[in-house]
Amino acid sequence: MKLLSLTGVAGVLATCVAATPLVKRLPSGSDPAFSQPKSVLDAGLTCQGASPSSVSKPILLVPGTGTTGPQSFDSNWIPLSTQLGYTPCWISPPPFMLNDTQVNTEYMVNAITALYAGSGNNKLPVLTWSQGGLVAQWGLTFFPSIRSKVDRLMAFAPDYKGTVLAGPLDALAVSAPSVWQQTTGSALTTALRNAGGLTQIVPTTNLYSATDEIVQPQVSNSPLDSSYLFNGKNVQAQAVCGPLFVIDHAGSLTSQFSYVVGRSALRSTTGQARSADYGITDCNPLPANDLTPEQKVAAAALLAPAAAAIVAGPKQNCEPDLMPYARPFAVGKRTCSGIVTP
């Protein structure tokens, strides 16, 4: 996909995203009730070599669409975060993050609560890829209890505003539930925007690429980009590395450049990556240097299992209904049950 052809994509989103957030006050009060039993949510959380109920320095990894936690991170941030001194933990909402994003979020919220308690009430970082970033921001927006438990958010290729490239799948009625929700202008992304979720809630770094073949628009290095959050540290790879630098959706997670930015974010005293920690000399699109040869091979093929899962996974012909707590923020949008009302 050529960069020039993507430039016009930004115009599509311009009518969907205002220059400033529409609502600045986040939802407050008690968390919404989970739709899933706690035992089911607990079963979706795993820590490397530790129990979530007793874990030292955890980092929560939230995977992308079409994958489990290990499929997203075995070849990259599970070993890399271990090298940085963390105990990696991850969620794997079934099936392969293809279900309702709101349900996927419940797995993350439950995991944060468990890991916070299991580490002695210590805040923890959350690191995400693709839909995982949307899940994290949805959770921080609508589940107030976790805001004080999350130390920082490092999001690789998040689609906070969805992607215009999901539209053709929706039109053919061959989209998974979460793909419907990740379409630009969906009820879910509208609710996130209107609830104040396009502004960082915890210290946040977003790393993304103009040449992403899955999430667009990402070309403007501005609030029009799907991965951009107000007040966040927004790092478009091409803004640092130049317009000819190419990393795809997977490379936004696995590349050496992504590792340097992510490492800075995790080490920073502010919770955001520091511009002084990365530059043109770090602009290597290949998998991170500190990975083994086997991990580098797996990282380079990261999208293959995701694509296979999406093709074989559940399909439906409409966007899942919003949970009651989110409906007031997307009045007038259409979901499976019809037009959203408060």
UniProtKB/Swiss-Prot annotation:
A biological process term (GO) from this entry: lipid catabolic process
Disulfide bonds listed in the record: C47-C89, C241-C283, C318-C336
EC number: 3.1.1.3
Signal sequence, start to end: 1-18
Top-level EC class: hydrolase
Keywords: Cleavage on pair of basic residues, Disulfide bond, Glycoprotein, Hydrolase, Lipid degradation, Lipid metabolism, Signal, Zymogen
Residue stretch(es) of the prosequence: 19-25
Source species of the chain: Pseudozyma antarctica (Yeast)
Keyword Lipid metabolism assigned: yes
Cited PANTHER family: LIPASE B (PTHR37574:SF1)
Keyword Magnesium applies: no
InterPro entries: AB_hydrolase_fold (IPR029058), Stereospecific_Lipase (IPR053228)
UniProt-annotated catalytic positions: S130, D212, H249
Function in brief: Hydrolysis of triglycerides. Is very stereospecific both in hydrolysis and in organic synthesis and has a potentially important application in glucolipid synthesis.
Name of the protein this chain belongs to: Lipase B
Catalytic activity: a triacylglycerol + H2O = a diacylglycerol + a fatty acid + H(+)
Superkingdom of the source species: Eukaryota
Sites carrying sugar chains: N99
Molecular-function annotations in GO: triacylglycerol lipase activity
